[in-house]
Curated annotation (Swiss-Prot):
PANTHER family: GLUCOSE-6-PHOSPHATE 1-DEHYDROGENASE, GLUCOSE-6-PHOSPHATE 1-DEHYDROGENASE G6PD. The keyword Acetylation applies. GO terms for cellular component: cytosol. GO terms for biological process: glucose metabolic process; pentose-phosphate shunt, oxidative branch. This is Glucose-6-phosphate 1-dehydrogenase.
Amino acid sequence: SYDSFGDRVTIIVFGASGDLARKKTFPALFGLFREKQLPSTVQIIGYARSHLSDKDFKDYISSHFKGGDDKTKEDFLNLCSYISDPYDTDEGYKKLEARCQEYESKHNVKVPERLFYLALPPSVFHTVCEQVKKNVYPKNEKSRIIIEKPFGRDLETYRELQKQISPLFTEDEVYRIDHYLGKEMVKNLLVLRFGNELFSGIWNNKHITSVQISFKEAFGTEGRGGYFDNIGIIRDVMQNHLLQVLTLLTMERPVSFDPEAVRDEKVKVLKAFDKIDVNDVLLGQYGKSEDGTKPGYLDDSTVKPNSKAVTYAAFRVNIHNERWDGVPIVLRAGKALDEGKAEIRIQFKPVAKGMFKEIQRNELVIRIQPNEAIYLKINSKIPGISTETSLTDLDLTYSTRYSKDFWIPEAYEALIRDCYLGNHSNFVRDDELEVSWKLFTPLLEAVEKEENVKLESYPYGSKGPKELRKYLIDHGYVFNDPGTYQWPLTNTDVK
């Protein structure tokens, strides 16, 4: 059971005039309200430096709302108000406290409940946290604070950030958001693994020969290169999103779904990870598309000339424990590729030849986005007079299996709801970040010493660096023979 908030809560969004708040935070709050997962009695206050009237603020945040009729939108916006003031002076926070107290006294709230959402860059985290604690955080209340990534740039900056925040708030009050943990298929991983004996019994190095977690974006930096140039793909999605997926995929069974039990097991498996071999990493940067219509990374005017920023990376992770020792695990991610997709591929050992001269390997594919799906590639006899086998699949595609009446929350909707309920399961704990930065910092330092970096160029809209296929084969992945597997419909020309 969780320590849930009640019906009279003040939700305060800092950075309310920013892109993140407009595109993610407020649409998520509206989505919860639309689905009656957020009480209609809460108060929502936006706080930012930008000078906006209440009307302009409401027009701004509602531009990305999905679904709901005009009445629902109007009812939600009636809960919202805006305060414009600097982040580093007391004045605005005193206005904020006055507005909170007015709401709480009007509704006779005995124990104030406040949720602070920091949709802000890390450079102002400390200032805002100090001001909140000083001016808007009475001792007798129940409060929670949501912090957005990045949680530092490396181990040193993470520790510095933690040193600033930990004296102000307890770990129980802090909710570090990695939106990948709110994705439906990621939340399904523990049930899939531990709720099915079929998988539970074979989820180990006796049966699995290869694991891949891949993240593909079909677009480049498109004018946002100035931000990406300082981050790179490893810091942007691999140290956080893909690592979170990997820990859920490889952790041991927790004693329960209790948040601390789950997070304890994630930390345990992280501690079994071997150091990443910086000499066994495939790095790339996209160039112009083959037809010349899409610009290369260095053509982005916001990028440093001759930048060595990594837009594609693949590397192997080794886990030294009884379950995973010897299984090659490859994380790979890239921008400006042929499609946008995130998925997990788990390949199993081959069956003994004997009866079969040639037979393909079983493979479990878990598609996180888009269009959530789980399918298991299996061998089956080709229908008709043939005695040949071909690969087919057992397929669970959410859109065809579950009726459209199912509300599948967006990642931010799911996570804000979890925070409201007091459920920490899908948020990142301090010691988890400490271990993950210890793992990734040496890799990042090696990659960012530019003289060491060998970047493979790949065309915008391609599958990635041409060396990728060989890299995957070298790390245990066996590709299907050409023509043996056809998706989604198998034709008579199957080999």
